[in-house]
Amino acid sequence: FPTRRSSDLPTIIEIKTIIGKFSKSEGTCKVHGSPLDLEDIKQIKEKLDVRDISFAISQEVQNKMNDRIFDRNGKSIRDWKEKVALLDEKKKQELEQLIDNKKPVKLIDIDYEFPEDGKDSTRNVSGKVLNSIAKNYPFLIGGSADVSKSTMARIVNTQNNSYLYPGGKNINFGIRESAMGAIANGIALSNLTPFVSTFFSFSDYLKGALRLTALMDLPVIYVFSHDSITVGEDGPTHQPVEQLAAFRAIPNFDTYRPSDANETIGSYKAILELRKPAAIILGRNKVKIEEKTKSSDVIKGAYIVEKEIKELEGIIITSGEELELTMKVYDTLQEKGYGIRIVSMPSMSRFEKQTDEYKEKILPKGIKTFVIERSSSLSWYKYTKEGYMFTIDSFGKSGNKNDVDLAFGFTSDIIEKEIERKLNE
């Protein structure tokens, strides 16, 4: 294409094709969705003058292909080997670890300073944890779909990745969620650890790429913020409702929705330890960092945050920011003399991987079980039943957090009264 070679402007190269050329169904939709029969395959081979041997590639073709690959890439390979030879021992070791996919990730000490007022948003904690990981783990690279200031998914003190600076840790993907997910899969195939980020309501734009992440078992970290109806006046377009249920249904994919700073740290520890496809779902509102939440228990999927003081009468399961609301409900019910247990379930898929003994210990059968989550009820029927879920099965509303919560009945007073009524039935 001499014209393309002589121009630095965008070029469209159009190549005319005929679907199913040489087949009896040439030029029709039949050849698109149906396999060719043996007779058709035979006559195609006769037309092309090729041997009638199944799956045969001649040595001549193989040799030509190998020569072509070497002609195109030989210089690049030689240049790469020369650059590797010039590396110091530390860099050579890191390169070997990258190629062998054996670089250890140490998250014993997270560089997170707990705020004086004891409150922080999980998206803010996530940003600090990502940067803490980046200090000790050179293979972390990622970015967002033009919303890093909102999702906090950005590595500080490093340049943006570009042609001129390929060592940059941040990638400016632009508002291109689908491409972002696909690029992350490619990066993961090189044994780097990519993270990508956008608002949770926009996760549907990259669902195809994310599904392939799970199919290929790639350790891509999906970071989604603005996780519920409490994100403000942007309204239903920015308020995810059905997304959590959909994510929890994806095979070979772990979805984490941490309640506070402790669980956010625990989510990242689990993600990096397991090296599996995963998403972390984050809130934008500051929430209390609970004394009894445990980062070490997140990998189990669910654990007891508050145990019943007297005989167990009811269990409340919750996730994300709703733990703060649930704790208020718990306090009131305990004061009234009810035996209530609070279970935080940051990851449903991780909980389902635990032993039957552990699951029975956390959620014993025969106990009235309630759910509090600002999301669809669809993923919760395994643990409870209709009428015991404080969830949302409609689109959200535009308004501030308190007004929207009130409109959907998400206040401690409303929920506490309904749970008390159910306990007495």
Protein language model regions, located:
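Residues at structural and domain junctions
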Residues: G27-K30, Q62, N66, Y112, ...
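Detector for methionine-enriched segments
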Residues: M65, M152, M180, M216, ...
